[in-house]
Swiss-Prot record:
Function text: Involved in the binding of tRNA to the ribosomes.
Record carries keyword Protein transport: no
Keywords: Ribonucleoprotein, Ribosomal protein
Family the UniProt entry places it in: Belongs to the universal ribosomal protein uS10 family.
Native species: Finegoldia magna (strain ATCC 29328 / DSM 20472 / WAL 2508)
Quaternary structure (record): Part of the 30S ribosomal subunit.
Gene Ontology process terms (BP): translation
GO cellular component: ribonucleoprotein complex; ribosome
GO molecular function, a single term: structural constituent of ribosome
Record protein name field: Small ribosomal subunit protein uS10
Tree of life domain: Bacteria
Amino acid sequence: MANQKIRIRLRAYDHELIDQSAQKIVEAAKRTDVKVSGPIPLPTEKEVITILRAVHKYKDSREQFEQRTHKRLIDIINPNAKTLEALKKLNLPAGVDIEIKL
């Protein structure tokens, strides 16, 4: 796998959870003696939802909720077979979405 890289994109609602997961991935990759770039923080997406507090009237009384999606990017440069095995064996929390591109 010469001159290749693995790009790992993490997404989660909890920034502490995503940072812990990124740290686990980086440590597992560094144990196999490969070069790791990241974790690179990507822009946080903020989704704001506005709803009426009352059902039938009082349109001026509204409530807003927001949901933030935190993202991180990790590049593993020139991975070997040990790196792939180490990444497969990682036990990461359920609240983190992982997208891997070879």
